[in-house]
């Protein structure tokens, strides 16, 4: 037996970040703490390095080991890959040693094909859910593995919504989603020149390769340069059995922090969407509800979640940023990591952890990054001016501070205008990881959709850039570079 490249969650622990990546090590640690984690395995960072050494292929030895671990997963879950009785569906997610929000790619619902969708539709008596999973999988796989842009699929969804006279994805029925899945496959064939893969093993290897490949994508390289992350580290891949937040109204998904990442105040801070999958919250596609509302909707899962938060914060002795899913009222933990926070919050959290007896004063001092102290001197609005002014719109204060600049609508324009010495505010429907360089060039960021845990919010807080998200009163006209708000029109350069 050669080198070991694959580890079950039960075989790892939180100290193995270099080998299992941050997400893999924390999934293993949560498993060891007895928390409800959907089981799976992690392919190590060494397999990523090997992939690049072998000329960007996964060698037969590593492929065989991965399939051996799929068999172990089948035994644990009692489900089988590509089976028509009880199919195993998995998520494939990246996990580098250092947290890189939005940089690396995720694929959910892997293992589906037309036959399997029919089976799970009948078995669950929930065809809407089955086809929703499939269309999401085709969309993610096409985007992440085959690099067919998201926008083609978004356009098809928007067309379908317009045809049905609805505004939200959730309002589309089973037949609409089935039709979308077929349109997506046709789009895939038109762009790639081959049929969408039906074989789960082929899908799995394609997805794993895509994660390894994304370690080298332009976004990831920009983020690494800014945050001093060595290229040689590589990324791990987590393959995990799916927990479904999109099976109906007794399901949902959310992202939460054990303390407020903007102020540092103690208490659950986060967001939740019913009948949704994880990507929906983070991608900021629908604007979610506050975590406190979860208590009314899912009292059992909420109670369990509060317990889990307490266990994790005491265990890691730091504020945690967690992703979770509720499937038919039952809680599943998908991720935990030390949460990104503003400099103000970092100061308050460090002091509070000392008061709560979790950290010594020496440890608390080391928790503050000296480079962040300057953001405590962030521009703030003049208190008198604020009282005198009439606000034209309201959104969520996702990242603190005050900013003023000229309006731009794309990341490219933000960079170009900054290069000319202009100060700009980037206005977007929602930001995506591709916008990171434009976000860096901006004084502030304003988005129409998305919440406090959306991509824009998390990245802006990390950069110390002022950000207002989810300002839904804005009517956007991206094509003509203008938007209206409070009865006025605003154009590029205003």
Task: Outline where the language-model segments fall.
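Conserved structured catalytic cores and adjacent interaction surfaces
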Residues: 394, 398-493
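Nucleotide/phosphate-binding sheet-loop regions of phosphoryl- and nucleotidyl-transfer enzymes
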Residues: 1-389, 422-425, 432-437, 443, ...
